[in-house]
Amino acid sequence: MNRSPSTSGLLPLPGTPSSSWALYRARLSNMFRNTDVSVVIAFWLFGLINNILYVLVLSAAQDLVGTSVPKGAVLLADVLPSFLTKLVAPYFIHRVPYSVRIAVFVALSCAGMLVVAAAPVEGAVGVKLLGVVLASLSSGGGELSFLGLTHYYGHGSLAAWGSGTGGAGLVGAGLYVVLTGWIGLGVRGSLLVGALLPSVMVVAFWGILPRGPLKGWKGGYERVAEPGEEEDGEEGFEDVPAGAASAGLLAPGPSVAATAYTHHHEGRTGRASFWGNVRRARALFFPYMLPLLLVYVAEYTINQGVAPTLLFPLDQSPFSEFREYYPFYGFLYQLGVFISRSSTPFIRIHHLYLPSFLQVANLVLLTLHAVLNFIPSVYLVFVVIFWEGLLGGAVYVNTFAEIMENVPAEDREFSLGATSVSDSGGICIAGFLGMAMEVWLCRWQVSQGRDYCRRIEAS
């Protein structure tokens, strides 16, 4: 059966040779007409709650730990367990039913919140970091599981998940400020409120999400027939014409994964051996994992190592204090992420390396400015930071959209979960790079007579 982006439920980039506005509107209308609203709502909530807890626990843990522990240690406690979970779990988690997984993740999330909240305000750093670790385990396991779950519910579920994860950054950053500042609950009270949030995932999975697609689950990675596929459904990369991917301006030629999956195909039993999954993961590295890893290394190095030093004289900015720069950069970044992670129903990017390399260019540009101070206005930096968020969100959601579209159905569930290790791996690498770069860049700026980064600490 021949499939292309034009028939997969994903839209080409407007203005490309294979698209017209009339055709584009027709496809868009068809996509939403065939989308189950309950699926969209459930996956949007999955993405929101799974990621908002990550943001909320990190913010609260930093406040509770105070100055006794470097921020980098808290960051690594929040990222490393998630990375290790995504690295290991795809090879055995397929034996655990989704209902059991979600129950465990909800319990871990609640426990993480409660452990951090119950720890004494002074000291008990190890206990607080334990709470962060529990929340990180839940976040990592949740991401790879919910991405795998989109295999059963189609492209609409993936778009909703991506939008929810993008919204989590904005909502999470604002929620902690509202709870601690506006409402005045304090750190502990805010965490206790946060411990209730995982119940939303319970409602979404058992109360909102249609369970029909999961009724045939047999305790392994499952193949789901494509809409309109014939019973004998001989699907694979061999059946996709070489020009099928050309429906978007950024589309590459035949997928790099095509040959790999042709050679490493394990059959259509729906269950895969450990070594079969290892071969699948190797086939995913260059077409999907590497561009996602690159974009995360670049953007989180910017966020953690470079952005804190992108400071201008206050009379040349809209701010009254130097410490106001970084939160606003974070807001612009999260806004860009939310927009681009919500964009796959409208715009698709097929060549994942292009935005990844553009993100690396952003890192180089902003690092050079931190050293040489050549960008004349902070408003230009605002544009670059917003662009950074757009690129990062676009690579994330389009990576999984490409897997959904190009990887054979019998390999897709594993591939969606296994590829998620790249984002946590990129954050871990960037965490180490960022700690070193922030210190070095600040020292360099002070030596050049620009001591703005030191004034943040004094604020």
From Swiss-Prot:
Among SUPFAM superfamilies, the record links this protein to: MFS general substrate transporter
How does this protein sit in the membrane? Multi-pass membrane protein
Q: Which Pfam families match?
A: CLN3
| Highest taxon listed in the record's lineage | Eukaryota
Q: Where in the cell is it found?
A: Vacuole membrane
Membrane-spanning regions, if any?
A: 37-57, 73-93, 102-122, 129-149, 167-187, 189-209, 240-260, 283-303, 325-342, 352-372, 374-394
Q: What is its main location?
A: membrane
Coiled-coil annotated residue ranges, if any: none
A GO BP entry: L-arginine transmembrane transport
Is Oxidoreductase one of the keywords UniProt gives this record? Answer: no
InterPro entries in UniProt: Battenin_disease_Cln3, Battenin_disease_Cln3_subgr, MFS_trans_sf
Keyword set, alphabetical order: Amino-acid transport, Membrane, Transmembrane, Transmembrane helix, Transport, Vacuole
**GO cellular component terms listed in the entry, alphabetical order:** fungal-type vacuole; vacuolar membrane
Task: Describe its function.
Answer: Involved in vacuolar transport and vacuole pH homeostasis. Also required for cytokinesis.
Family, similarity comment: Belongs to the battenin family.
The protein depicted here goes by the name Protein BTN1
Q: What is the lineage of its organism?
A: Eukaryota, Fungi, Dikarya, Ascomycota, Pezizomycotina
Gene name of the record: BTN1
